[in-house]
C-alpha cells in the first residue's frame, strides 16, 4: 500500500506549504517552501491510487445495480462521486499552490500586503461608498485585494486594489419555444486611493448595471469631455472646482490609457478609479511545479508589477492638479437631473 502512503504524504505536504505561503513575510520564506517541495521523496505527482480504488469499487457495485439491485445503484453513485471528488480536489491543490506562491511573491516584491477582513466585509464597505460596485443582477464578489502605498514627488498615496467579479443573468428564448436562464460573468478592477482634495464628484465613461444614485449631471465647456464622460456632483461648486482645463485634458488622456474608466470621489475623501484592464495587476508567469528549478529562479528574482505603478503615477498627477485648487477657473452649467 506504498502508493496510498505516497499520496497521503503529498496531500499533507501541499496543505503545509499552503499554510506557509500564507504566513510568508519575505521571498526567502517562499523559497524555503519550494525547497521543501524539491526535497519531497517520490516526486510531486499523485498516483491517484485512492481515486482508482474507489472507481473500481464503483464499477463493481454497478454490476448488481444494472441487474436491478436498487441499493447498489446508490452505492455505485456514491463511490463514483467520491472517486471524482478526490481526484479533482488533489489536482486543484497541486495546480493552485504555484499560483498562490506567485501571487504572494508579487505582493512581497512590490511592497503590497493583504488589507485584511473578509471579501464580504470589503464588498459591503465599498458598495456603501461607491456606485461602481453596484453591478451584477445575479451575484457579485470581491475576488482579490492588495494594499500598498505609492510615494510620488509631492504626496504619498495609500491605495487598495480590488478585483470585482459580477454575474448578470437573463432569460433567453430558444427556437423551440422553450426558454433558459443565461449567466454571464464579468470582471472589474479598481484602485481605491486616499484622496482628500476632492469630494462628492463622479466622472464616468461606463455606467454600472443598476441605476446610480440620483445626482445632478453637469456639462463643461469641453465638448470632447462631455461626449466621453458623464460628470456628476453633489453641487455645482464642487464640480466647478474640480473641472479645471488641465484636469479635463488629463481625464481625456486617462480614457485612452484605461478601458471604461470611472472616477468617483466619495464624501469620505477616497477616490475609486475603476476600469476593465486586468493587466494593471499582471506579472510574469513563473511557471508550475513541474519545473521547480525554473520556478525557484523566477521567485528568487521577484515578480514585478510593470503596469500598476504607472497607473498610480497618473493618480498622483491628478492629485497634483487638485491639491491647491480653490478657484473656479471653468464655468460648469447645470444640464439635467438624472
What are these regions (language model features)?
Residues 44-52, 86:
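General structural concept
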Residues 119-167, 179-338:
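Charged, low-complexity intrinsically disordered regions
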Residues 81-106:
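Transmembrane-cytosolic junction motif
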